[in-house]
């Protein structure tokens, strides 16, 4: 029998059934492919094969023993007790004397004839015969089918969209079988076929049982872990007929464990107790084994294993085409008694509900989630089993129920039978429908999870908009589960590293995954289910009105609910994932159900007129059958097909004008003025320029022509294809070419210290305790890590083909001195560490060799800080992205492209531009150096953000020396270039330029920003004064550690100035200039060239060569200015600029012309009054927004909130009294909030950022006095406490509110605002409570804007609230609402915010409020040192400036 049943069983399927699939490769290595080949294995043989765990060996040998053991005679089961009414008690059984023992199972062959078959009521024990009984025995019900366990296909089945999966075997084997109609009093008659004969049973005792003296003791029910949702019905015992409890058996009766069981079919598959790991399996689990159901042939219900894995979909969809149906109405519901799975005599009351799809039962009629559900498609037969009882029989399980009366029992049976018949009719109708039905849908995520309240893991499947819970994988395949959760009422939330909560209005499901990676994958899948549940099918149904749009344009799957809006094709979910991989330049993927805002009426009409019909007529005109996709195609096949179809245009129908660009453009311009959308699609797909010139200046582009012709659909199609790439046959992704080359075989092994993988960049230092010691093996392109060197099964592995980046961390970045990071395509980051530098370096080199292709092996010749591949555009192929290999070493970025020559390294500190373009999802890093531009795309966010950070850091200034600064094309530091260029543009005619000093605070802020990232600083007139910029330049040159002329050559320069012979002196200068470092030499030339231009306008700026030398001599040579040697060198260099620096006449003439033109333009601008072009006129209100209170104010770039307030009060003649705190407020009417501007805050940026619902108001700030008193009396600069908190963000972008206000604990210190879910530490305040535990959220405090007030629409719990707005570097705004309990608490929080954000200066000191005049924009133009006088006076003034610039302000 074993041979007939399991002959075709492969080793992989057999081991999977035993839950030992990890040994599949081991068996195949030893030539064991089929299960029958394993018959001769022994314990020693398994050990020699490498199987070291004794429990696994015993499980395999037990399976072999069961499969190949000789058949045993059919045992006779012991007599079983008959259930009585609850008020009737059983008498103790009559003891059997030793001379007359009951027959045993081994005596069957010696009996002359089989004893009469006792009457049996389905799953109940056989009734005893009595000698005085005259009534006819109860009719025997048709025998039931043998239960088959653990039929597990090699590919996981796909549950349907609208509910849990249905067992396919029940649909296929019995689709044509009709259910018998059951009359109210009729009993099913036994079938007369031999297969229905029951095995012989031993005859029971002849005496009738006498009533017992006392009722049996019923074992107490174990307490529930969760009162509202226990797992008493989900024990490892399947739900079958009842068995006799141990408490009602006497010593003479055989114990349940000794009752012989029916013979099982020999099988290599493991038994239920081996899978569950529980040896205490109930006897009723086998009550019907070997007995077919309803007299149907056993052979029809017990096919070989492979026949249970058919080619048809395992879980057919049971609704009609047209999308998911609404909630199924309940057919019948009511209370029924249900036989428990433990076989107890005590029936349990259950609320049972039947709809068109499921039979479910609950603890009560108020429960939202069932204890069990049985798909109607799984029900084979419904049969009565006695008074008021009936059975629901599936292909694998039998469920027994008892009603209050026979009438109710018959009503339930009739409803169930009718539901089954109608379900099968619907299935036949949907299968035959011309529209087709949605193909079997793979679960978005399926696997085992721990659920709080359950002792064993549950099998969880996320399919469509439901989360389904099953007891194990077997039940998932059978379709009979615990419950399912509709995600339209669900929300998922991360709890800790491995746990998350699924919250519904009825219950919180707390799940735990095996790893942090699995948890994030489950979160993503469940969030997708929520999005799908909250979607609408209105757009989909409209687009499906066109027949071709009802099937996926690529694989043919029915009812596709995604689309590519630029290609104008409707696609299924699985193809949509691969379309996204093509990039937005090829396919812009949108959902028909979730992206509702995208689907304008014009776009819907475009899909109805174009869509899949004409689309495939063009794109798929030449698809060979061997390359066509099917709904079941693998992701790899889809990816290959879609690359060829849309990126390369391999299967497209070529236009007759293909290859003639000019004619294609003309034809496109003609086509867009007509309604022929297919022609427009064909022209664009064959290379016509979407923005080509039409020849008509009034309508220069095809889009303008379509608009002129009133062709709305043509306009929509052209807009969607503005950035679409033209298909090219040579556009195969370079990665495919990379990996077609055999990579070198690298092998390495050893111990590494490893942390858990992360899905986010590592922001914090990982302590040594967070690392685990692992034995790592790199072999055959796989990096595997084991628990130790003796372990056989790896804890995990990283394939070299999936590695996208390898980074070496700086020393002591983490707990180990040497660490490196590995990034994979799955957005995971692995951190490894070692103490030994040589071992760490060897590991890095081996891993790099394993994943870098031969074309980029030159990158391994030098040590690198980061190595990997990134999609980019460079050179002449800017239309097509390619995969480039990059290596970062210091400030050099070396790149290798698959189809390009080796290029010089990119000097990051010499970049002309480093910027980030695009939105948060499609970021592009732009690097511009000399004549090269490189666009690096952020296809994978994790490694892209890491690359972005290190490139920005490498491109920034590394130190204070000149060579460590950001450099320009000619090796001039960007700081010097920015300052010199600004002064050339704005300060050549400024009187006393370089002699006057700017404001110290502004100068320092400007210099700090220039030192941090000079490339991103753009100096603008009106925002920075020329004296501030000139002072910043002088301070930068003076603070150089080595000086501009270097410490080694400084003395030689000073000595050269004393040479009397001019020619010899100039020659010496030129000689010294050659010996300067390249950056110093270029900087000296640029600076002297600038000073030469400044002295050309000495008549206006009063800065001749001598005056400039007095200023720059001590600055460049870092002297005290008491002698003139340093000044003499500068003066000589300016006077002999042309000779010393070898400037030809043409260059000198061009330089003079440029400078002269700049000065003329400034003079013309000053005469016409347009020098303040940056000023802005804004409406400001006094006290309230009324027409009579508005003032139109001209706001220059330098105006502060204090200056604006004073000007408004001056205009209205409002006097400021003592303790009047007039302030300018930014009022947002939409948010019902306002923000008092800080007195030093610049107004112009705020005015530019005001929306239509915002305005500025000058009014008294009533709370300022109380806030100042609080700040004066408080201790420390921190605040903490509880507040009501609400986050204002959309749920998955659907615009749904995120809930109400919740209590949260906040800590505000000098650097950040932190949010905690609860207060964990009860210790007294120590000034640093934030160290007690990690916060739930954290924001930098200086980047927050705090508005007083919360809009009433949110129903704040108190009226003392404020709104916090945070704007990220990408200009993304996030908003939160906080409420305090009292007004005083609100004032304290707001005062602390202002104090922290402005370094304690909340309100200006009193003297600064006395002056009512608006400061002059050019106040800094006042001369602070004499412009004329003797040389000694000038020298003394410069020396005083170098000593203390602020001392010069004493007499001003």
Swiss-Prot record:
Q: What happens when the gene is disrupted?
A: Progressive retinal degeneration from postnatal week 4 with the fundus developing pigmentary changes, retinal vascular attenuation, optic nerve pallor and outer retinal thinning. Defective phagocytosis in the retinal pigment epithelium. Conditional knockout in the retinal pigment epithelium results in optic nerve pallor, attenuated retinal arteries, retinal pigmentary changes and outer retinal thinning. Conditional knockout in Mueller glia results in mice which are phenotypically indistinguishable from the wild type.
Q: Where are the zinc fingers (C4-type)?
A: 552-575
Question: Which residue stretches does the UniProt record annotate as biased composition, category Pro residues?
Answer: 92-104, 154-167, 205-225
- The segment(s) forming the Rho-GAP domain are 956-1141
Bias category Acidic residues: which stretches? 228-239, 271-286
- Membrane-related topology note: Peripheral membrane protein
- Under what name is this protein listed? Arf-GAP with Rho-GAP domain, ANK repeat and PH domain-containing protein 1
């Amino acid at each position: 029998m074993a041979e007939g049943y399991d002959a075709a069983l492969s080793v992989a399927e057999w081991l999977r059934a035993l839950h030992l699939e990890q040994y599949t490769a081991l068996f195949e290595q030893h030539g064991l492919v089929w299960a029958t080949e394993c018959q001769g294995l022994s314990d020693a043989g398994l050990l020699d094969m490498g199987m070291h765990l004794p429990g696994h060996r015993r499980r395999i040998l037990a399976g072999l023993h069961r499969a190949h053991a000789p058949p045993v005679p059919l045992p006779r089961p012991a007599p079983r007790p008959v259930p009585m009414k609850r008020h009737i008690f059983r008498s103790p059984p009559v003891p059997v004397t030793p001379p007359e023992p009951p027959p045993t199972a081994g005596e069957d062959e010696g009996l002359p004839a089989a004893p009469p078959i006792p009457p049996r009521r389905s799953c109940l024990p056989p009734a005893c015969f009595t000698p005085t009984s005259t009534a006819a025995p109860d009719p025997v019900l048709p025998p039931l089918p043998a239960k088959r366990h653990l039929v597990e296909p090699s590919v996981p089945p796909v549950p349907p969209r609208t509910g849990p999966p249905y067992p396919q075997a029940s649909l296929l084997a019995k689709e044509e079988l009709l259910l018998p109609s059951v009359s109210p009093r009729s009993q099913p008659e036994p079938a007369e076929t031999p297969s229905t004969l029951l095995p012989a049973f031993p005859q029971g005792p002849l005496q009738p049982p006498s009533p017992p003296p006392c009722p049996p003791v019923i074992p107490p029910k174990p307490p529930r872990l969760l009162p509202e949702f226990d797992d008493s019905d989900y024990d490892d015992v399947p739900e079958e007929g009842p068995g006799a409890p141990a408490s009602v058996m006497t010593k003479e009766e055989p114990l349940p464990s000794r009752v012989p069981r029916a013979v099982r079919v020999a099988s290599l598959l493991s038994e239920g107790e081996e899978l569950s790991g529980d040896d205490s399996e109930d006897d009723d689990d086998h009550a019907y084994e070997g007995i077919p159901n309803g007299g149907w042939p056993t052979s029809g219900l017990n096919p070989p294993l492979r026949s249970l894995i058919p080619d048809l979909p395992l879980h057919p969809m049971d609704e009609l085409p047209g999308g998911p149906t609404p909630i199924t109405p309940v057919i019948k519901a009511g209370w029924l008694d249900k036989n428990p799975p433990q076989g107890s005599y005590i029936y349990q009351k259950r609320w049972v509900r039947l709809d068109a799809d499921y039979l479910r039962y609950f603890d009560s009629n108020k429960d939202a989630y069932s204890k069990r559900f049985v798909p109607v498609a799984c029900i084979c037969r419904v049969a009565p089993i006695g008074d008021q009882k009936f059975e629901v029989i599936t292909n694998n399980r039998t469920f027994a129920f008892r009603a209050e009366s026979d009438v109710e029992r018959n009503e339930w049976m009739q409803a169930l039978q009718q539901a089954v018949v109608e379900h099968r009719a619907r299935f036949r109708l949907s299968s035959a429908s011309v529209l087709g039905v949605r193909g079997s849908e793979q679960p978005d995520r399926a696997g085992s999870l721990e659920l709080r309240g359950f002792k064993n893991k549950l099998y969880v499947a996320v399919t469509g908009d439901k989360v389904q819970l099953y007891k194990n994988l077997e039940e998932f395949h059978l379709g009979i589960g615990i419950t399912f959760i509709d995600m339209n009422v669900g929300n998922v939330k991360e709890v800790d590293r491995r746990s998350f909560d699924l919250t519904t209005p009825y219950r919180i499901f707390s799940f735990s995954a095996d790893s942090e990676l699995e948890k994030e994958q489950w979160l993503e899948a469940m969030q997708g289910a929520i999005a799908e549940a909250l979607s609408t099918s209105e757009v989909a149904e409209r687009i499906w009105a066109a027949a071709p749009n009802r099937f996926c344009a690529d694989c043919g799957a029915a009812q596709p609910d995604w689309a590519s809006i630029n290609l104008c094709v409707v696609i299924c979910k699985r193809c949509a994932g691969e379309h996204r991989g093509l990039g937005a330049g090829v396919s812009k993927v949108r959902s028909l159900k979730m992206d509702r805002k995208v689907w304008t009426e014009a776009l819907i009409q475009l899909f109805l007129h174009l869509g899949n019909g004409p689309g495939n007529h063009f794109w798929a005109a030449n698809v060979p059958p061997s390359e066509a996709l099917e709904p079941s195609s693998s992701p790899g096949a889809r990816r290959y097909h879609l690359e060829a179809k849309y990126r390369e245009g391999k299967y497209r129908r070529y236009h007759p004008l293909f290859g003639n660009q000019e004619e294609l453009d003309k034809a496109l311009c003609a086509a867009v003025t007509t309604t022929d959308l297919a022609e427009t699609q064909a022209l664009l797909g064959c290379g016509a320029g979407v923005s080509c010139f039409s020849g008509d200046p009034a309508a220069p582009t095809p889009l303008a022509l379509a608009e002129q012709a009133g062709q709305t659909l043509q306009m929509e199609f052209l807009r969607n294809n503005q950035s679409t790439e033209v298909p090219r046959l040579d556009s195969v992704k370079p990665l495919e070419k990379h990996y077609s080359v055999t990579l070198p075989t690298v092998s390495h092994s050893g111990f590494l210290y490893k942390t858990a993988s992360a899905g986010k960049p590592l922001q914090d230092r990982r302590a040594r305790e967070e690392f685990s010691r692992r034995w790592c093996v790199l072999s055959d392109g796989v990096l595997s890590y084991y628990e130790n060197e003796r372990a056989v099964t790896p804890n995990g592995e990283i394939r070299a083909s999936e590695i996208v980046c390898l980074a070496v961390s700086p020393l002591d970045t983490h707990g180990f001195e040497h660490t490196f990071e590995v990034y994979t395509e799955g957005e995971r980051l692995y951190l490894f560490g070692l103490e030994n530098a040589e071992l760490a370096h060897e590991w890095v080199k081996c891993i790099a060799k394993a994943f870098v292709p031969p074309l980029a092996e030159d990158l391994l010749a030098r040590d690198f800080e980061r190595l990997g591949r990134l999609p980019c555009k460079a050179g002449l192929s800017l239309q097509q992205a390619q995969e480039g290999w990059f290596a970062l070493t210091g400030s050099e970025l070396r790149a290798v492209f698959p189809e390009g020559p080796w290029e010089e390294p990119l000097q990051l500190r010499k970049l002309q531009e480093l910027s980030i373009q695009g939105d948060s999802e499609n970021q592009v890093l732009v690097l511009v150096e000399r004549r090269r531009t490189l666009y690096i795309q952020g296809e994978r966010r994790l490694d892209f953000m890491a690359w972005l950070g290190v490139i920005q850091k490498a491109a920034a200034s590394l130190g204070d020396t000149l060579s460590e600064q950001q450099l320009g094309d000619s090796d001039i530091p960007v700081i010097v270039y920015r300052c010199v260029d600004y002064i050339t543009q704005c300060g050549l005619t400024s009187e006393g330029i370089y002699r006057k000093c700017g404001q110290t605070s502004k100068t320092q802020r400007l210099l700090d920003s220039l030192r941090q990232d000079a490339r991103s600083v753009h100096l603008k007139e009106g925002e920075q004064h020329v004296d501030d910029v000139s002072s910043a330049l002088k301070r930068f040159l003076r603070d150089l550690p080595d000086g501009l002329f270097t410490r080694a050559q400084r003395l030689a320069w000073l000595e050269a100035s004393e040479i009397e012979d001019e020619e010899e002196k100039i020659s010496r200068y030129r000689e010294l200039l050659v010996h300067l470092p390249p950056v110093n030499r270029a900087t000296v030339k640029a600076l002297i060239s600038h000073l030469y231009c400044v002295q050309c306008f000495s008549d206006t700026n009063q800065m001749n060569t001598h005056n400039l030398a007095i200023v720059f001599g001590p600055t460049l040579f870092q002297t005290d200015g008491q002698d003139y040697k340093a000044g003499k060198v500068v003066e000589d260099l300016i006077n002999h600029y042309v000779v010393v620096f070898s400037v030809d006449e043409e260059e000198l003439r061009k330089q003079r012309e440029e400078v002269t033109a700049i000065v003329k333009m400034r003079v013309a601008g000053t005469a016409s009054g347009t020098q303040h072009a940056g000023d802005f006129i804004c409406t400001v209100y006094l006290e309230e927004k009324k027409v009579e209170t508005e003032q139109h104010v001209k706001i220059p770039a330098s105006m502060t909130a204090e200056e604006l307030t004073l000007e408004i009060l001056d205009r209205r003649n409002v006097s400021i009294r003592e303790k009047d705190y007039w302030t300018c407020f930014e009022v947002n009417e939409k948010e019902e909030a306002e923000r008092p501007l800080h007195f030093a805050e610049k107004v112009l940026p705020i005015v530019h950022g005001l929306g239509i619902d915002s305005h500025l108001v000058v009014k008294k700030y009533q709370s300022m006095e109380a806030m100042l008193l609080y700040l004066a009396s408080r201790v420390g600069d921190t605040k903490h406490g509880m507040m009501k908190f609400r986050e204002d963000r959309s749920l998955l972008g659907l615009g749904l509110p995120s809930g109400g206000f919740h209590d949260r604990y906040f800590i505000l210190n000098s650097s950040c605002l932190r949010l905690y879910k609860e207060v964990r530490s009860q210790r007294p305040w120590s000034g640093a409570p934030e160290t007690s535990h990690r916060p739930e959220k954290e924001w930098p405090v200086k980047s927050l804007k705090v508005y007083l007030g919360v809009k009433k629409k949110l129903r704040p719990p108190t009226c003392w609230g404020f709104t916090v707005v945070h704007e990220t570097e990408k200009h993304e705004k996030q908003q939160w609402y906080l409420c305090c309990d009292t007004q005083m608490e609100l004032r304290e929080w707001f005062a602390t915010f202002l104090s922290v954000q402005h370094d304690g200066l909340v309100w200006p000191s009193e003297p600064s409020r006395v002056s009512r005049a608006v400061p002059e924009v050019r106040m800094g133009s006042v001369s602070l040192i004499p412009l004329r006088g003797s040389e000694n006076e000038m020298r003394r003034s410069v020396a005083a400036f170098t000593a203390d610039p602020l001392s010069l302000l004493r007499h001003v």
